[in-house]
């Protein structure tokens, strides 16, 4: 990668005269570019209009090499290309001098030239130019950029099944954003939320996607240069199917099919009994139907987290053959089925990595998706797969699941580390995952920053930030260093403040409940000690929202560290109840305090106490006692969250790209206020179970303005009950706003399951 500014025609040394976009301009696109719909030219015209109010003309052209071009960029005049149209921006191909996906962008006073080694290279160059236009128009810096990605496959993985089904309109909007940040693959994850024929008992009431939705979205993605890849659970994660009357006999534990629905159990008990002959036919049916809707040859069969394999109906077979052999045999059959139909199978690699003997039993043409989500992840498992000779994507996470607010430090640390390891060990792709466990309570817009982190690191994982060797600066293809440096060249006195903020409080989800890893730092302490995360947040805020202060994303980052009682805690509290007043021991065994940043010794002690509880009331009290070091800080957390909301709102009001800010900021503010209510719920529940001693006045003050203190006495159980009821009412009012925001980007889906948790907590406060 090179970034070279031209010498200035006038002015002080080191301060080149910027290039002014003309009042009347044209964008010309070489007809050899595979962009029949003119998407790239239209993207540029749209961004120029948004930045300047001027609508440029668009022309298609046939470039002729070897002749002087009317707008030849003087900084890179050879080879020149003649055009039939006088255009200020030219898009063209030059496969003789540039590699596939590589591009060269020249901004000169005589015009702008975007050249690609292939169509995707042109697309990549156009996206860099768009980012510069968004930050600098109408005056752009003079420069030449030549660049290509570290990873040829830069994918995003979107959960559309664990409670939330995005609308087709929102999916298209998200694909637009992925294109801007140079992603070229999107995997859409389905368990039960697709309208498969003859499986209506599985998908009923979930607002399932239809075949026409997939066909339309596949076409839309293809026009943007994004490969839409099907991803369907075909082994594990069949919780909803295994609860139906028609299909329960295919599960490891069909006798449990009528247990009360639970977010916790949904993540644990969902594995097919592969000794049942119909199971393979069931998986084949899903594959055969779904793959027909996509133009890609790739297919992700998933195959992850098969926790119950060999524990239920298949236990005798496991005792005879071993779980590893059973797993490898079933996955191999699925992969061969796809290969015989001209498809390229891929699968999640967690089981194979934990049982490495599986790696030698799988077909050679299978791509392993090596998901490793711990913020402090090491390179061992990436090296293991590389040494086994298996092609792999390394897969990181945006860290939004199970919470209202995104854990941006965890996301950045995980994404940046893993991108380096993948390059080191020759990974063939980089995939950023966006999960929605526990009902997908996380608003889809909370993933924007993590998505951009991933785009940056997939493009240039070895770049530097603030002089610190690390992963992911903006000199690649996301929160682009090009665009950032361009903005610096045009705005000499640009503000770059992170701003002072209160010390962060414990996060509700530090650590990694997927791998058992731990965060780099004590809960609540920003993990990016070298300042790289803060700098990336600032750059994301500027390129995405036009927020030069960085305050929008930085406030969101800080808010995630103010969790005294989180969504996962509310789910745990409710689902400790079997549904009939008895303690749910299976749910209790899934609760790990390590994901809250507590030390291993402390977490193990309280987890053992929880499992030793004899009834529901004792279990809930024990859970709250274990979490009490966080819960008692609710007042401090809510005061800080109020400050975060004000900082975020003020920064959004000053943002130059108000349209983009208005699209996301309401969801951010709602998440912050929701967390304030959740913190109060934890405080009231802890008081109700005699875990802490607070009076009504303490609770009202802890609300930081959400509840006015009562003029009467705040002592006594009646006053505490009254303020708890007011918390319940406030929580329910907030939830109606949350529902409105949900419906703005998602179908109704399984919103009622989230409502059930919210209302059960509200009812507990009233009891």
What residues fall within each predicted segment?
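Conserved beta-strand edge residues that scaffold enzyme active sites
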Residues: 63, 192-193, 234-236, 352, ...
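Substrate-binding cleft of carbohydrate-active enzyme catalytic domains
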Residues: 152-349, 359-361, 367-369, 378, ...
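Substrate-binding groove of N-acetylhexosamine-processing glycoside hydrolases
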Residues: 2-4, 9-15, 28-30, 34-42, ...
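Contiguous, structured surface segment used for ligand recognition
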Residues: 1-154, 417, 424, 429, ...
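N-terminal small/glycine-rich loop or linker at the start of catalytic domains
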Residues: 144-161, 394-401
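Short catalytic/ligand-binding loop motif for oxyanion handling, primarily in non-cytosolic enzymes
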Residues: 123, 237-239, 309, 438-442
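Beta-rich nucleic-acid/ligand-interaction surfaces
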Residues: 64-67, 79-81, 196-197, 201-203, ...
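A structural preference for short, hydrophobic beta-strand core positions in alpha/beta folds
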Residues: 58-60, 230, 347, 394
